Amino acid sequence: HLLQFNKMIKFETRKNAIPFYAFYGCYCGWGGRGRPKDATDRCCFVHDCCYGKLAKCNTKWDIYPYSLKSGYITCGKGTWCEEQICECDRVAAECLRRSLSTYKYGYMFYPDSRCRGPSETC
C-alpha cells in the first residue's frame, strides 16, 4: 500500500516520500522510462520491476502486515500478494537509505521530458 511504503521510506531515510521521492529522476513515482539517473533512481527502477512481476496483485492499494522495530522493517504473514508487495517495498526503502549519500536535489522534480531513450530491461 502506498501509505505503508511511505512509512517505510520515512523510517529508513528520515525523508517523506512526498516531496523527496515522488517525482525524483525518471523512475520514482508513477511510471518511468529511459535510464535511471543515479543510485536513488535505480532503487525506484528496481522497485518498478519488482511490482511488474506481481501483475495479478493490487500493488498500490493492497494492505500488508509489517512492523518497524529496532531499526528493521519486517514483513509479516499475509496472502502471497501481500507478502510479495511488502518485500518489494522493504527492499526499495532499504535501497533508498543506502543511496542517501548520492541523493541529488536537482533530480527531485525531474521533468519526464528529460527521460529519453529506451528503458532498461528488468
UniProtKB/Swiss-Prot annotation:
Q: Among its keywords, does the record have Disulfide bond?
A: yes
**Which cysteine pairs make disulfide bonds?**
C26-C115, C28-C44, C43-C95, C49-C122, C50-C88, C57-C81, C75-C86
Cofactor: bound how, per the entry note?
A: Binds 1 Ca(2+) ion.
Q: Which reaction does it catalyse?
A: a 1,2-diacyl-sn-glycero-3-phosphocholine + H2O = a 1-acyl-sn-glycero-3-phosphocholine + a fatty acid + H(+)
Q: What is the pH-activity profile? A: Optimum pH is 8.0.
Q: Pfam families given for it? A: Phospholip_A2_1
Keywords, A to Z, come to: Antibiotic, Antimicrobial, Calcium, Disulfide bond, Hydrolase, Lipid degradation, Lipid metabolism, Metal-binding, Neurotoxin, Presynaptic neurotoxin, Secreted, Toxin
Spell out the catalytic residues: H47, D89
Q: Where in the cell is it found?
A: Secreted
Q: Which PROSITE patterns match?
A: PA2_ASP (PS00119), PA2_HIS (PS00118)
- EC number(s) on record? 3.1.1.4
Describe the thermal dependence of activity: Optimum temperature is 40 degrees Celsius.
Please provide the Gene Ontology terms (biological process) for this protein.
Answer: arachidonate secretion; defense response to Gram-negative bacterium; lipid catabolic process; negative regulation of T cell proliferation; phospholipid metabolic process
Q: Can you quote a single GO CC term?
A: extracellular region
Query: Known Gene3D superfamilies for this protein?
Result: Phospholipase A2 domain
What job does the chain carry out?
Snake venom phospholipase A that has strong antimicrobial activity against the Gram-negative bacterium X.axonopodis. Antimicrobial activity is not abolished by EDTA or p-BPB and is therefore not strongly dependent on the enzymatic activity. PLA2 catalyzes the calcium-dependent hydrolysis of the 2-acyl groups in 3-sn-phosphoglycerides.
Family per record: Belongs to the phospholipase A2 family. Group II subfamily. D49 sub-subfamily.
Assembly and interaction partners:
This toxin consists of 2 subunits: acidic and basic. The acidic subunit is non-toxic, without enzymatic activity and comprises 3 peptides that are cross-linked by 7 disulfide bridges. The basic subunit is toxic, has phospholipase A2 activity and is composed of a single chain.
Protein name per its UniProtKB record: Basic phospholipase A2 A
Q: Which organism is it from?
A: Crotalus durissus ruruima (South American rattlesnake)
Organism lineage reads as: Eukaryota, Metazoa, Chordata, Craniata, Vertebrata
